[in-house]
Amino acid sequence: MHLPEPDPARLAKKEAAVKALLAVLPRECVLHSAEDLIAYECDGVSAYRQAPMAVVLPRSTDEVSAVMKILHGLELPVVPWGAGTGLSGGALPLGDGVTVALAKMRRILDIDLDNGCAVVQPGVTNARISQAVATEGFYYAPDPSSQIACSIGGNVAENSGGVHCLKYGVTTNNLLGLEVVLADGEVLRVGGKSLDAPGYDLMGLLTGSEGLLGIITEVTVRLLRKPETARAVLAVFDTVEASGQAVADVIAAGMVPAGMEIMDKLAIEASEDYAKAGYPVGKEAILLIEHDGPEVEVDYLLQRTEVVLRAAGATEIRVSKSEKERLLFWAGRKAAFPAMGRISPDYYCMDGTIPRGALAKVLGKIRELSGSYDLRVANVFHAGDGNLHPLLLYDGNVPGELEKAEQMGAEILKLCVDVGGVLTGEHGVGIEKRDLMTYQFNERDLDAMQYVKCSFDAESLLNPGKMFPVLRRCAEFGSMHIHGGKVPFPELERF
C-alpha cells in the first residue's frame, strides 16, 4: 500500500504549530523530535509505518479543545490515537499531520452503581473498567481480545466487539453517553446516564466513526451485574467446516450463548504453545461455547448444547468444571493473536462478517485460497455473530509477501460481501479496507457517508485518507464520483 509523501506546505507550519501547542500544553505533552515520534509510527498494523509531524498528549477535554482550535486554525490534519492496538490502520499517522494521543486521559471519573454506569476518560483500558467494579459484582461486557491494552476511546471509535458480543452486544450496545471534541474545538455532549434521549441518535453515529467526526474525550458506559454462573464448553471437530455448521445448529436450536468462538488447527497449536490452556493439539478445529445466567438455566443449556454438538459431529466435548478451567479455556482464545508470533514473522488479520449459515462455505473457500496463494491461514474468530478473523501468515522480509497477503485478504473480504456479509465487524475500515468500500457500497451510499463527514468536518482535517476510497476535500465534494465500482484517477494519492 502506497503512503503519500508529506505536503511541504504543511511541514513548513511545524515550527508555528509546536510553538502554539506549547502555549497550551506543558513541554512533556508535545513531542516533535524524531526519537520521540518512533513509538507512534503505526498502530497494530505494523506493516504500514509513517512518523507524524508531531504528537500531543492532552490531559483533559479543555486541553483537547485548545489543541484542536490551534490545529484547525493552521489547517493541519489530525489523527486521534487511543492505545495503538487497532488492526485496520485507522490510527496510522500522517507525515504532515499531528497525532492527538489520549494516553494521559486515563481517569475513571465516576462510578454510579445505582444507575449501572461509569464515566471514564478515553485512555482508560477496557479491562480496567471491569476491574474497578468487580468487588461490587459488576462488569463491563464488551471484551476484545486486546482488552488489557486497548482503550475505551478506541473501542468507541471502532465499535469494538469481543468474545461475549453475541449475547451482550458490541460497544454501541453498552454506551449511555459521549463527550466529543469536534474539528474546530467545539465540545459536544450526547446521551447521558439515562437509557435514551430524544432526537437523532448522534451517539450511534459517532460510535464506529473511526476518528473522522470528532475526538472522544469522555465515555459513559453501561455496567452489568455479573451472572450467577458461567460455564464453558470445548468441542472438538474433524473439520473447520463442521465446527462452523455446529454454530448455526446451536443458534437454530433456540439458544443464544454468551460467546461462541472457533479456532482451527494452526491457531490451536500456536495458542496452546503460548498459553498452555489444555487445547487438543493436532485436532482440526475446536468450538468454544459459554452459557451464563442462573445455575439451573445454565445446566439445562449445557445439556441441550451437548446434544446438538454431538449431532453436528463433535468427537470430544469438555465442560469446564471450575471457574479456573473456564478462564483457562478463554485464555487460550485471547492469546491467539500474540501467539502467532511463535509460528510466523508477520500476520495480516481480516475482519469480515457473514451470515452464520455461510460459515462452512466461506471457511472452505478460505482453505482453497490458502493453497492458491501459498500462504498459511490461522482461523480464529467470533463464530456466534459470524465475525471472521483469518490470520494470513507471511514474512515481510520476503519481497512480495505482504502484497500477496493483501491480495488474498481482499479476496476473502469480497467473498464475505458476496454471501451477504460486510467488510468489517469490529476492526474498522481504516486504510486496510478503504479501497474495498466500493465493493460493498454504491456511489449514493458513499455520497451519503461523505455528506455526514462534511457536516462535522468541512475541511476534512480529522483522520483524512481513512475509510473513504475517493480523493476529495469536502469543498470539492460532488466533483468526483465512483463509476462501475472504480475510483477515477487511481494513481493519485488519497490522503
Question: Residue locations for each model-derived region?
Answer:
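A glycine- and small-aliphatic-rich helix-loop capping segment at beta-alpha/alpha-beta transitions
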Residues: 88-106, 134-138, 161-172, 219-225, ...
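N-terminal flexible segment immediately upstream of the FAD-binding catalytic core
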Residues: 1-69, 86-116, 145, 267-276, ...
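C-terminal substrate-recognition/cap domain of FAD-linked oxidoreductases
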Residues: 31-41, 221-225, 231, 235-408, ...
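Feature of Fe-S/electron-transfer and energy-metabolism proteins
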Residues: 1-15, 35-42, 55-63, 69-73, ...
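Activity-critical C-terminal alpha-helical subdomain
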Residues: 186, 434-495
